[in-house]
Structures are given as C-alpha cells and as structure tokens.
Amino acid sequence: MDRIPVSKKDTGMRSICVFFQHMWQQLNLNSLEIPLKEVYSFMGYNDSEPDEQTRRTVEYLLRECAQFLRPQFKYVIVDGTLDLEQNQLTLIGEKGPVTFDAGKIICRQLRGAQRYAVFVATVGNGYFQWTDAVKRRDDMFQTYAMDCVGSQIVESVADYMETVLQKEIDPSGFKRTNRFSPGYCGWHVSAQPALFSLFTEKNPCGIELTESCLMLPMKSVSGIIGVGPDVRYLPYTCGICNKKDCYKRR
C-alpha cells in the first residue's frame, strides 16, 4: 500500500491523504462471499429454484476453480472535478488530467465526492486455464455454468474491494458511492483506455485491453467510486437507466 504525499494545498484532506494512494490485494477464494443465489440469477433463475443437476454442477465448479483462480484487485485514489453542466468528470492522475464524458446518471450519483477511487478487479489469468479444462469436457451446460460462476466471482471480488476501501476511509468520516463502470449508465466503454491510464502500470492486475476495449481475462471489472463525507451509497436504480441488458437489472 503506497501512501499519498501531502502538499500544503492538501492539508484539508490530510486525514485521508495519509492512508493510501494505491491498494493492491490478491485474495483467497475462501475469503470471498460467493452467494449461490447470485450465481443462479446469472443463469436465469431469478424467480425459480434451480434443479438438482444445476446445483451440483455449480457447487462442483466452485470447488474446482480454486485450483486455477487467483482473484485480485487494485485501486488508486485520485483528485478530480465534476462538471454537472457538461456531465463530465476530470480525474488527476500521475500523468496529468483525464476527462471522461461519464454521462448524466453517473455524474449525478457522484455529487459530493471529494476524491475518486479508480479500480480494477479480476478473477486472475488462471481463468484461461480453467476455461480450457472445462471446455475439453465438451459439456455445453458445464461451460455455461462456468461462465456464470466466473461472473459472480469477479462481482464478489469487487464487493470485497469496496469493504477494504470503506475501512480505509472510515477514520476520516468518509463514505463511498456505488461503483460505476464504462459501458453502463451512459458511460461509453471506449473510456476504458483512459481509465487504465490512471494506473502506474499498463496492465493493472494483469488485465489487458483489446482494441475493442474488452478486458482480458473477460471476468474482470473496472470503474470508479466516489468518496467523501457527503456522498451516498444507493441501490442500483434501474428506472433511470435505459441499458436493458445490464447485469444489475432485475
């Protein structure tokens, strides 16, 4: 964990500055809460119970994946300014300012933030070996279930990351917003390269970006979280977003 150097202009933020700038952790799967209900939801079981075969398959895959996956996350805290008229967010990284057309929904949700956590989370590069092992069995259902298990694991990694972030900012009386990612809530996925540029390394947590801004391993997430004494953490409000295929939509 690297600390933020405090300059004179930062003295009003000293209580948060002394805690961190970068945070990276690799996790053991046993430290993660992976709700089976959420895995089944990814599989389409929103209002119904999965059958016995589905339950056995998911439980087997959760045991098996521990051999392959090395979940990890990283976040960096940066200064930034929010322009609610232009619906833009400018973040100040080590290489200079980066401006995002984050859209009305996200900018409104970030109101009150004094700083911003830029994050990535992933199941790790072992996901490639795990998918190869499962696909060699030539079992389409197991391959589908594996994809859903991976989706929930990376969500659990991001959830865990949020608890770590909150513990770091608690002594300052800071709260956090929801996490927001390029590709959702009106923020175009093409913002990914600019977001990644805010990290010191090209491939944080070993995540690579393709030319189409797809993250590899695919079971990876990135985004921002606002922090400050006046921000709010709200349930995901699907009614104000027009993305019909969002994974958070219920």
Regions found by a protein language model. Give the residues of each.
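Structural signal for hydrophobic packing residues in well-ordered secondary-structure cores
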Residues: 62-69, 73, 165, 169, ...
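Active-site helix-to-loop segments that bind/position phosphate- or nucleotide-bearing substrates
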Residues: 19-143, 232
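Short terminal or interdomain "cap/linker" segment that borders an active site or interface and mediates
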Residues: 172-248
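Conserved active-site and cofactor/substrate-binding residues in soluble primary-metabolism enzymes
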Residues: 56, 60, 152, 156, ...
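Intrinsically disordered, low-complexity segments enriched in serine/proline and basic residues
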Residues: 1-19
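Extended alpha-helical regions
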Residues: 36-41, 241, 249-250
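Internal, well-folded beta-alpha domain core
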Residues: 138-198
